[in-house]
Amino acid sequence: VASPSELDPFAGLPDAERLRRVPLLAGALEAAPLSGGITNRNYKVTLAAGPLVVRVYEHESSALAINRENEHLNSVAAAESGAGASVIEYLPVENMLIVGWIEGRTFSEADVRIPENLPRIADACRVLHAGPRFVNDFNMFA
């Protein structure tokens, strides 16, 4: 007999109800929280077609005053540049942004200090800045 979590990959997740309401995520095989995210709860959701990242946010939790519509449009621009994950779906009513999964890991401060990593970082910045202009400038101190 299968356990509830085997039948429902969202069982036990803080955003389970919200995740279950998204048609794209129906038939998910696995769902697991991802670390990080200052203003989001992030999940790796694996579908038959492959993994996605679901970013869930609360409007009132955004201490950085992030405009989520701008974040969506800027994510599209980053994807178009080739520096960001593809944007799969933006669901403002559910407070979600769903993007493609990129295999890898986030660099730590220590990783950035390794000289051999600097060309990769510079290349990623070059690709991003050569792409479409973001719809706004973000300054968390403004």
Tell where the protein language model's regions lie, with residue ranges.
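Juxta-kinase regulatory segment immediately upstream of eukaryotic protein kinase catalytic domains
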Residues: 1-30
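ATP-binding pocket architecture of kinase catalytic cores
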Residues: 32-141
